[in-house]
């Protein structure tokens, strides 16, 4: 959740290290991260030893839960049942948390981020690693599909899952979705 800007725990650190090992043969030119500590830390661990420039961008920060920040959606006794149901099953129509954002808000700001990358000639042939969060990442990925309402696209992504996308002539294609570089049984 956004306002709880927490560091990765030991398990998160391990997943980021394993993901970095799995991606070691990919030549990246740039890292763009959400400004939240856990996203920056993930990027640093995945890209360890590469000495790449990192830019932070608030447009890929996680969905704000506003007054409900810090509540675990799955286990909450505070969140309205309709909110929980829509969050998992129809996030596009999920109500905005009081003082927070809707998924549609996040779709708009991640679309702006996506368009800024696509339209920037400096990134035309660049391989960019983007470190973001579950909801923000899925909203960013929606730019590659016609149907923007199917946000989760089969489920909430696992920690450190990777989507590989390609943009040619302004058209984005998802090459791989939710690839993981670790054994889930660990």
Model regions and ranges:
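Short coil/turn segments at beta-strand junctions that form active-site/ligand-binding loops
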Residues: 27-29, 124-128
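Beta-strand elements within well-structured catalytic alpha/beta cores of enzymes
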Residues: 126-132, 136
